[in-house]
């Protein structure tokens, strides 16, 4: 880790990535904290986890948060052992000139972000460059979706996901073997979310009328892989309130679950990681 302005006690060297590896430039303290949390959660689940940082063009559409963004913002992805990839949006840039999409090991990112006591408390300590070791682009499992074009299916109470996780953990205690959670449990479709047809989305009828309008609308079938990933990455509270939502969206072969603290993505055509 180094401070590009020689502030905050993290070192004095400045510039782009070192010749021997990749670097990330962190633009605010919140991003430094969130990057460290994401990396440590990923490593806790899988010691071989990867982090992928893909820059967002300035002013690019973003249906997660806002209609436009400043420069220096990226999607930060993390692999999980369940198959879906986790994602947060942060004020981070790939450090090497000309690169807008880099992959590094999550344990390297965890090491250079330190713990909460080493994070500076003011944005005067940033931008800061983090040396993250060798590139791991060839190890990334599959692709990640491009921004835009998502269809929101519906919102589901976060408590539903925590309940599904708790019940599945109970089953897993009895059925798990030396290879971890059984594939049959992970692949099980546990929740079907149906949305209204676009022309009917503004309606608020209940009962049979609402059910009829949902016929022909977007559908998302959620598996335990997504439930475990969303919960294990801490993207929803452990004890959510009754009105805490998880937004479910679809785009072609992709599904996305948006929790308060981050999102998980899964593709029906994307190979899953072994447990």
Give the location of each predicted region.
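N-terminal ordered "arm"
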Residues: 1-91
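Intrinsic disorder/low-complexity detector
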Residues: 5-6, 102, 109, 202, ...
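Short, low-complexity, polar/charged sequence segments that are solvent-exposed and flexible
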Residues: 44-45, 94-97, 274-275
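A short, sequence-level motif marking secondary-structure junctions
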Residues: 81-82, 92-94, 269-273
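A broadly used, surface-exposed interaction patch
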Residues: 85-124
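Long, compositionally biased intrinsically disordered terminal regions
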Residues: 112-275
